[in-house]
Amino acid sequence: IRQPGLERAIEFELEHLNEMGDPCRKILILELMGKHSNIIFCDEDRNILDSIKHVSSHMSSVREVLPGRKYFLPQTQEKSDPLTISEEEFIEKVCKKPCSISKALYTSLTGLSPLISEEICYRASIDGSDAALSLNETACIHLYHTFKRLIDQVKEGDFTPNIIYRCLL
C-alpha cells in the first residue's frame, strides 16, 4: 500500500497467479477526490484494465481513464509541497492568487481538499470566500502560521478522529 506524495490517491499492489500459474502484479488505485473519486484497476505496467468511472476526452481535457490507456495522476507540478513550503513561497503562491482564499489554498498546495482549506480558514478566523488578494500581509502571515500548525499536527500524528452523530427528530 502506498500514497504517491501527498496526492489524494492510494495504490494497492496485488500479487496473484495468472492462468499459467505464473506470479503477476496488479495495481488497484483509489482516487479520493470528492465527486471525481474513482477506483482504477491496472496491470503492472500501469495500463488501465478497468475503472468504476470511465472518463473520455469529451469529459476531461486533462486525461482519459479508459481500458487500454496508460494510468497517470493529473499533473500537480504547479502545486507546492505543504510539508516544505516556506512563508515567503506561501505568500507568493496563495495570497497573490485572483480567487477565493479557500480556493487559493487547495489549488496551490498538493494534497489539500476544498474541505481542509475551509478548515484552515476557519481556524485562522478568515472567511474562505473572501478574495485572496484582499489579504494584507499580516493576515496572510497569520494564515500561513495557522496552516503550518495544522500541517505540524498531521506530521506528528497529533489528532483525534471523531464521529459526529446528529439526530434529526
Pin down the residues of each PLM region.
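Phosphate/anion-contacting hairpin/loop surfaces
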Residues: 2-169
